[in-house]
From Swiss-Prot:
Binds 2 magnesium ions per subunit. This is Ketol-acid reductoisomerase (NADP(+)). NADP(+) binds at residues 25-28, 51, 53, 83-86, 134. Substrate binds at residue 252. Its EC number is 1.1.1.86. Its cofactor is Mg(2+). It is an enzyme of class 1 (oxidoreductase). SUPFAM superfamilies: 6-phosphogluconate dehydrogenase C-terminal domain-like, NAD(P)-binding Rossmann-fold domains. Mg(2+) 1 binds at residues 191, 195. The active site is at residue 108. The gene is ilvC. Belongs to the ketol-acid reductoisomerase family.
Amino acid sequence: MARMYYDTDANLDLLAGKTIAIIGYGSQGHAHALNLKDSGINVIVGLYPGSKSAKKAEEAGLKVLSVAEAAQAADWIMILLPDEVQKAVYTHEIAPYLSEGKVLCFAHGFNIHFGQVVPPPTVDVVMIAPKGPGHLVRRTYEQGEGVPCLFAVYQDATGQARDRAMAYAKGIGGTRAGILETTFREETETDLFGEQVVLCGGLSALIKGGFETLVNAGYQPELAYFECLHEVKLIVDLIVEGGLAKMRDSISNTAEYGDLTRGPRIVTDETRAEMKKILREIQTGQFAREFVLENQSGKPGFTAMRRQEAEHPIEEVGKDLRAMFSWLKDK
């Protein structure tokens, strides 16, 4: 079993007297900034001119600067921007101010692992990655708890990089729940694999495939939506709470028997071979190169795929059905 580290393993004093710049104030950015602030750390926020998030950050009591100003003023710089914009922002607004001994932080290893960002050898480069969305990172912190985090060291220029990463994780509440040490390579490759094969790519393809099969067989689209999309949350909640065992213990015997006898016919040896192929594309950097080139060319293919997916019948059916769900109206 991997070792977990907790509050007593991390030294928050390493952040004392330091200024941490949070670059970006989205889902993760606001949670990191506010949690660190509430942990007694001096936090500033770096945003581009005209950012709609500036007012929110200022109303929360945070000092907002341009990205370049924040990078220049900070001892620690946490980049919480979309993967595809990090290289340009780093190159033009952060790199010129990375003086010796500073700490460059990430919450995902994509740009470091695939060589899009190449820091100077005189700075620590670390990763602190909460395994939950920003609103959960913030809410659990306020409740005196936390969200588990991954942490990693890519470059240790000061001899303190590992301790510094753990201190940051403590500052955002991660060590209350437990933090797990990894590497930039492992985090990046497993994260991309999970997104593509299971959580996003695999699940959305499975949902659409099931929906289309029922509709093409003459069943009402609304029933197909309920059975193949809506009830996914009911099952996933059980799995998150207690693993596959709790899910199977909570469903009917009919459903469990169907799971055990028919499920393996969906994920076949051919499917597993494709999973291995996708993993290899991630490991070799093929996916990263494809994604970077797509963004550099203005995202024509990405935009077309988004448009095509938005026009899928499941979206129209879902929109009408969700209007009936009173528990969603407040959201």
